[in-house]
Amino acid sequence: QALDLGTGSGILAISLALRHPQLQLTAGDLSPEALAIAKENGISLQATVDWLVTDVCQGLPQDRAYDLVVSNPPYISEAELDLMDESVKRYEPSMALFAEQGGLAFYRQLAKQIGSYLKPSACLILEIGFRQGQAVVDIFRRAFPQAKVSCHQDLNGRDRYVQVEINE
């Protein structure tokens, strides 16, 4: 079972579904409009995904537990607006980009809510802002003290995603 939270256009969920057809994939987003686009994209690419309106974990089925959780959530702080490319500011919905609490609101909510939706051995892979690595690592180390939590860099050497490996 795999879960994509904050799916937006569905690219992560669709890519996983096509590359790993054995996965049962669920993708959630707060925006019904984004989900409609994601669903269209999934249909056009023949990807099997269960699309749900979710607010972080609210709206997820209570009877499912996930092995893998991926997310490219809103993580940009309002203070970083000037660092953004004009095309992104012009064409991307602000709710898909910006998060409160210095861009960390989604990660804090996820760390509090996701535990009951995970299998005993699970992995979370979360895209982050290039200035957020240590903060997101700390959030998940506090929430899952037994987990291996690591930050990984992109080709430019900037923090790009945090991986949380849980083995209970």
Model-derived regions: residue spans:
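Glycine-rich, phosphate-binding/catalytic loops in enzymes
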Residues: 44, 84-88, 142-143
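Conserved SAM/SAH cofactor-binding pocket of Class I
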Residues: 1-83
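Short, well-ordered coil/turn elements that cap or connect secondary structure elements
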Residues: 20, 46, 92, 119, ...
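Residue-level signal for inorganic ion chemistry
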Residues: 12, 38, 72, 88, ...
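C-terminal beta-strand of the catalytic ATP-binding
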Residues: 75, 165-168
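Conserved Class I SAM-dependent methyltransferase catalytic core
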Residues: 101-164
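Mobile active-site "lid"/loop adjacent to the S-adenosyl-L-methionine
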Residues: 75-105
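S-adenosylmethionine
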Residues: 67, 89, 138-141
